[in-house]
Curated annotation (Swiss-Prot):
ANK repeats lie at residues 39-68, 72-101, 105-134, 138-164, 198-227, 231-260. The modification Phosphoserine is found at residues 299, 422, 432, 445, 472-473, 477, 507, 509, 601, 618, 692, 695, 802, 852, 862, 871, 903, 908, 910, 995. Residues 682-864 are annotated as: Interaction with ROCK2. The keyword GTP-binding does not apply. The gene is PPP1R12A. The modification Phosphothreonine is found at residues 443, 696. Key regulator of protein phosphatase 1C (PPP1C). Mediates binding to myosin. As part of the PPP1C complex, involved in dephosphorylation of PLK1. Capable of inhibiting HIF1AN-dependent suppression of HIF1A activity. It comes from Homo sapiens (Human). Residues 385-402, 469-480, 564-610, 643-660, 773-795, 903-913 have a biased composition (Low complexity). Residues 290-628, 643-928 are annotated as: Disordered. The keyword Glycoprotein does not apply. This is Protein phosphatase 1 regulatory subunit 12A.
Length: 1030
């Protein structure tokens, strides 16, 4: 039973075995070795790139093509040039490689060597006859591609030696195509040969490269406008892909099929450059109109004999027209090219002067296109379109291109077009916001125009030139103004507000623009302004209620002087209204304890808008003429005089005005606000700009650096000053009481005390950059000292962008003696000023050394000297030192507040203030002895010298920029080389990996043999088992 069961199982196993996969395997294994066969050319290129000359020679003997090119058109010689393999280059050239063979982009080996900067290869190739005037597909010669100076020099010398005309070389292809097209047209037979790889025709090349003359001639000769290359591309595909608008227009005018697709189903719209998609859509609409008109013409079934005759005559006329216009083309082709150059130059100029936004330009170009459409089209039309002129489209014969202008089409002038259309629409083509903003570049304005002035000016500008200037943008030069007027005559008005550029610290663009404005506009000189002021002083020796003073808009200097001179009493509570610097008036003048004659009061400080705009040629003058609002806090009565509003706030004793609010208000008139920067950033920027701003006329670089150092020191000491602030105030109160008692003794001692207090308050103000309002009693001395400090702070903030100071050259001689005295008095004053931090005194000295005008720093003894000098002058003695002092004092007190904006130059305001309070008669006596002409000549000479230095500095800066650019370019090239080295290393690593893989592949047959042996053994075992089972 057991044996029967075993046999049955074995039989079942055998049944399963028969027909199984293993049983179906043949008993003898077929061993077919599959080999990868490479193209001979690919093997040759690989051998060349590896540098194996023996292998290359074997392949050449076997019949390999030495000029074999890969898919990119690169030959072995190209690759050797790129790899910097000089030996292989020489080997290939010696073995007959074509030295001028181009790749798919038209690059010959010399292009590759020039691009990589391999001098030795380039020299060898040139020596072997490489063509230095060879042009690639983009019209670049090896000289254009060369980056390193040595390579450029080598190629340029070779071009000069061979006498190659580069421009002629660029146009060589177009010239040859024109010649062939004319031959085909004259012979009536087209002998074109398609490109071997792409199947492209002459029409494809002319369309892709924008050879419009060739394109017209080929179409005229009877070329099919819808001809396809091997990829199914039509000439319209090529023209659209390469963005050639004129070529697209010519093809569409000749009724090419715009819906044709290439082999991958793309229309011309799918492959078109983004820039001309809209233009293609417009052309399609135009073509649809033409087709519908043709259908309308063909609708009559019966044609009269007259129409037939017309058609016959039209055909003959077409032939005649061809004969007539053909020589015109030959003769005037050069003219057309010159005309195109002129057009491009005009476009460049228009780009510079363009100040409108892109939307405005579109509207502008559309309106122009409409006017152009209404002009009669003097082109010769076919019989089909001769009767329908109502539509603004004309179909021309193939000879004459349509004069139709569309909103986005830049149209060059061709000699065959009958209508002449201005290419103004091309402005938009290369235009970016950077280019059109250059037209109205905004200089860093240091004082914004008043709202009133800006609105009036804006209205005036709109009425005249159609351009709205921003408050700080310079007037355009006369040439730009003329262009704007020309635009207006065409019926276009362009509104533009210059972009708000943050204030910059004397950047090169500012300097250049200011120099331009200096040359294009006449300026009112400083001596003129001062003499005008001097005349006014003589006229107004008594109190003059309604007097107005003209002042040059280039120096915004009268603000503090006018305010200080119009304080008639020591206990007054003045409120100064400043309608953005256009109106200043003192509203209240209460009890008078000391009667001092002043030059003006109330309305005497008004300066009308017309006077403000007195020297309106220069925008810089406009800017400087607008002083910042002045804030005068007086002990019990705090007055915040912000722009255009007068605020009178009565507070109790001890109220301190909000200095932060004052500063906010003041800054709002100093810096034009940018939309994208936050309020805190804007404040910080404007404060920094005010502190270290320099003028274009009188500040030297050393002055600016010293000023910045001073500001740096003041910031470090600011925290300490705040800690000592309360102590200072207590000290001041005590001193105020003492001065009140001393005041009763004599006027002279009281004035001395004023000066002590004034100079101290002055220094504190300088340290804190904001007005200090004392909360003490309402004594005259406290109110005056507080007012003077606030005036000083406002003059700091109102630093105008004008002549920074009279020259440092002549002022140093005047002030040297006084400086020495000031340093001695510093030590004596230590006992008095113990409450003040040491940093104040330390900072006072460098400021004193930076003075630009002849006003000495105030000390008690020097003030006594001044009083002695003044009395000497009144008696009639004219000592030299007294004269110079009176000159400098007079300039300080009379020119205007801007002369004392010297927060950077460290001048004492108490000096000029007290000088204002003295009678006019004594000052006028001193004024008579001054020689303003000599001073003016000195200033002028110094300014010229500084301008020359500035110009030299600018030149050096531009040179440095050029060197920097060259250096960065070199670094980029070095980076490219390192990248190339990395690629080489990667390639070597990959080659090693390939060789390892090949070794493993060699082991593969052994493994297969082992596998087969095991299979055979398995089959044998199975057979043995099956026999045993039986």
């Amino acid at each position: 039973m057991k044996m029967a069961d075993a046999k049955q199982k074995r039989n079942e196993q055998l049944k399963r075995w028969i027909g199984s996969e293993t049983d179906l395997e043949p008993p003898v294994v077929k061993r077919q070795k599959t080999k990868v066969k490479f193209d001979d050319g690919a093997v040759f290129l690989a051998a060349c790139s590896s540098g194996d000359t023996d292998e290359v020679l074997k392949l050449l003997h076997r019949g390999a093509d030495i000029n074999y090119a890969n898919v990119d058109g690169l030959t072995a010689l190209h690759q050797a040039c790129i790899d910097d393999n000089v030996d292989m280059v020489k080997f290939l050239v010696e073995n007959g490689a074509n030295i001028n063979q181009p790749d798919n982009e038209g690059w010959i080996p010399l292009h590759a060597a020039a691009s990589c900067g391999y001098l030795d290869i380039a020299e060898f190739l040139i020596g072997q006859g490489a063509h230095v005037g060879a042009v690639n597909s983009e019209g670049d010669t090896p000289l254009d591609i060369a980056e390193e100076e040595a390579m450029e020099e080598l190629l340029q010398n070779e071009v000069n030696r061979q006498g190659v005309d580069i421009e002629a070389a660029r146009k060589e292809e177009e010239r040859i195509m024109l010649r062939d097209a004319r031959q085909w047209l004259n012979s009536g037979h087209i002998n074109d040969v398609r490109h071997a790889k792409s199947g492209g025709t002459a029409l494809h090349v002319a369309a892709a490269k924008g050879y419009t003359e060739v394109l017209k001639l080929l179409i005229q000769a009877g070329y099919d406008v819808n001809i396809k290359d091997y990829d199914g591309w039509t000439p319209l595909h090529a023209a659209a892909h390469w963005g050639k608008e004129e070529a697209c227009r010519i093809l569409v005018d000749n009724l090419c099929d715009m819906e044709m697709v290439n082999k991958v189903g793309q229309t011309a719209f799918d492959v078109a450059d983004e820039d001309i998609l809209g233009y293609l859509e417009e052309l399609q609409k135009k073509q649809n109109l033409l087709h519908s008109e043709k259908r309308d013409k063909k609708s009559p079934l019966i044609e009269s004999t007259a129409n037939m005759d017309n058609n016959q005559s039209q055909k003959t006329f077409k032939n005649k027209e061809t004969l007539i216009i053909e020589p015109e083309k030959n003769a005037s082709r050069i003219e057309s090219l010159e005309q195109e150059k002129v057009d491009e130059e005009e476009e460049g100029k228009k780009d510079e002067s363009s100040c409108s936004s892109e939307e405005d330009e579109e509207d502008d170009s559309e309106s122009e296109a409409e006017t152009d459409k209404t002009k009669p089209l003097a082109s010769v039309t076919n019989a089909n379109t001769s009767s329908t002129q109502a539509a603004p489209v004309a179909v021309t014969t193939p000879t004459v291109s349509s004069g139709q202008a569309t909103p986005t089409s830049p149209i060059k002038k061709f000699p065959t077009t009958a209508t002449k259309i201005s290419p103004k629409e091309e402005e938009r083509k290369d235009e970016s916001p950077a280019t059109w903003r250059l037209g109205l570049r905004k200089t860093g304005s240091y004082g914004a125009l008043a709202e009133i002035t800006a609105s009036k000016e804006g209205q005036k500008e709109k009425d005249t030139a159609g351009v709205t200037r921003s408050a700080s943008s310079p007037r355009l030069s006369s040439s730009l103004d003329n262009k704007e007027k020309e635009k207006d005559s065409k019926g276009t008005r362009l509104a533009y507000v210059a972009p708000t550029i943050p204030r910059r610290l004397a950047s090169t663009s500012d300097i250049e623009e200011k120099e331009n404005r200096d040359s294009s506009s006449l300026r009112t000189s400083s001596s003129y302004t001062r003499r005008k002021w001097e005349d006014d002083l003589k006229k107004n020796s008594s109190v003059n209620e309604g007097s107005t003073y003209h002042k040059s808009c280039s120096f915004g200097r009268r603000q503090d002087d006018l305010i200080s001179s119009s304080v008639p009493s020591t206990t007054s509570t003045p409120t100064v209204t400043s309608a953005a610097g256009l109106q200043k008036s003192l509203l209240s003048s209460t009890s008078t304890t000391t009667k001092i004659t002043t030059g003006s009061s109330s309305a005497g400080t008004q300066s009308s808008t017309s006077n403000r705009l007195w020297a309106e040629d220069s925008t810089e003058k406009e800017k400087d003429s607008v002083p910042t609002a002045v804030t005068i806090p007086v002990a019990p009565t705090v007055v915040n005089a912000a722009a255009s509003t007068t605020t009178l706030t009565t507070t109790t004793a001890g109220t301190v005005s909000s200095t932060t609010e004052v500063r906010e208000r003041r800054r709002s008139y100093l810096t034009p606000v940018r939309d994208e920067e936050s309020e805190s950033q804007r404040k910080a920027r404007s404060r920094q700009a005010r502190q270290s701003r320099r003028s274009t006329q009188g500040v030297t670089l050393t002055d600016l650096q010293e000023a910045e150092k001073t500001i740096g020191r003041s910031r470090s000491t600011r925290t300490r000053e705040q800690e000592n602030e309360e102590k200072e105030k207590e000290e001041k109160e005590k001193q105020d009481k003492e001065k009140q008692e001393e005041k009763k003794e004599s006027e002279t001692s009281r004035e001395d005390e004023y000066k002590q207090k004034y100079s101290r308050t002055y220094d504190e103000t300088y340290q804190r950059y904001r007005p200090v309002s004392t909360s003490s009693s309402t004594t005259p001395s406290s109110s005056l000292s507080t007012m003077s400090s606030s005036l000083y702070a406002s003059s700091q903030l109102n630093r105008p962008n004008s002549l920074v100071g009279i020259t440092s050259a002549y002022s140093r001689g005047i002030t040297k003696e006084n400086e020495r005295e000031g340093e001695k008095r510093e030590e004596e004053k230590e006992g008095e000023d113990k409450s003040q931090p040491k940093s104040i005194r330390e900072r006072r000295r460098p400021r004193e050394k930076r003075r630009s005008t002849g006003v000495s720093f105030w000390t008690q003894d020097s003030d006594e000297n001044e009083q002695e000098q003044q009395s000497d002058t009144e008696e009639g003695s004219n000592k030299k030192e007294t004269q110079t002092d009176s000159i400098s004092r007079y300039e300080t007190s009379s020119t205007s507040a801007g002369d004392r904006y010297d927060s950077l130059l460290g001048r004492s305001g108490s000096y000029s203030y007290l000088e204002e309070r003295k009678p006019y008669s004594s000052r006028l006596e001193k004024d008579d002895s001054t020689d303003f002409k000599k001073l003016y000549e000195q200033i002028l000479a110094e300014n010229e010298k500084l301008k020359a230095q500035l110009h030299d500095t600018n030149m050096e800066l531009t040179d440095l920029k050029l060197q920097l650019e060259k250096a960065t370019q070199r670094q980029e090239r070095f980076a490219d080389r390192s990248l190339l080295e990395m690629e080489k290393r990667e390639r070597r690593a990959l080659e090693r990996r390939i060789s390892e893989m090949e070794e493993e592949l060699k082991m593969l047959p052994d493994l297969k043999a082992d596998n087969q042996r095991l299979k055979d053994e398995n089959g044998a075992l199975i057979r043995v088992i099956s026999k045993l089972s039986k």
